[in-house]
């Protein structure tokens, strides 16, 4: 069997085991058995449990990022449709690969700084991608000021909020029966785009420029 095929089988088995049992509880024996190979062969290919887990994080992070980017490649989409397409692709991927999402969203973030840093890199790329979508929305919305006028921190802050909300909703959607990717994306769009649309039209929350009222 070609090396890349055997390695993919081992990685698939590792993602399933790590995702369902957690990093600490998962054993190399179980991973080898699920992959249909010997444990020495797993070590030969991927050296240690830590390196295997790191490889799983990187592979699944790359796959998620690719799914989101591929979701918005259709030319001529309006800004809201591009964001909708990206969110739908995000939720579809996390729903279709629940073990991978568990590895990225739960296991990697709670089992050491090295693993958390790998996921943080993926998140930074997502935030950067969403930031680009927001800037594009500003440029193509005639009534709005350029979002750059708000300052980089404001734009990135909105992108951070959207990514964080999407991450939280993916966990909820995967644990709630019968929630589809389109339903999850629609819920987030209904929440986010109404407010974002006002921002693009130059509207601001008035209380943001005045003292918080006391009760």
Question: Residue ranges of each PLM-predicted region?
Answer:
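Amphipathic alpha-helical packing segments from all-alpha helical-bundle domains
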Residues: 62-66, 113-142, 156-160, 183-197
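Helix-turn-helix
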Residues: 9, 13, 17-51, 55
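Hydrophobic alpha-helical connector segments
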Residues: 55, 70-99, 143, 152, ...
């Amino acid at each position: 069997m070609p090396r890349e095929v055997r390695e993919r089988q081992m990685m698939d088995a590792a993602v399933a085991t790590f995702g369902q049992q957690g990093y600490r509880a998962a054993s190399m024996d179980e991973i080898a058995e699920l992959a249909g190979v010997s444990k020495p062969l797993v070590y030969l290919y991927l050296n240690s449990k830590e390196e295997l887990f790191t490889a799983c994080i990187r592979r699944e992070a790359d796959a998620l990022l690719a799914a989101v980017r591929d979701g918005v490649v259709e030319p001529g989409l309006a800004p809201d449709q591009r964001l909708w397409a990206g969110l739908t692709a995000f939720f579809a991927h996390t729903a279709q690969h629940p073990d991978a999402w568990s590895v990225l969203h739960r296991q990697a973030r709670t089992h050491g700084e090295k693993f958390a840093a790998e996921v943080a890199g993926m998140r930074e790329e997502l935030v950067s991608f969403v930031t680009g979508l927001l800037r594009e929305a500003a440029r193509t919305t005639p009534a709005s000021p350029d979002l750059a006028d708000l300052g980089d921190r404001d734009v990135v802050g909105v992108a951070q909020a959207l990514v964080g909300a999407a991450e939280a909703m993916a966990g909820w959607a995967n644990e709630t029966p019968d929630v589809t990717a389109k339903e999850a994306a629609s819920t987030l769009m209904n929440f986010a785009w109404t407010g974002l649309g006002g921002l693009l039209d130059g509207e601001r929350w008035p209380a943001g420029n005045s003292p918080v009222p006391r009760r």
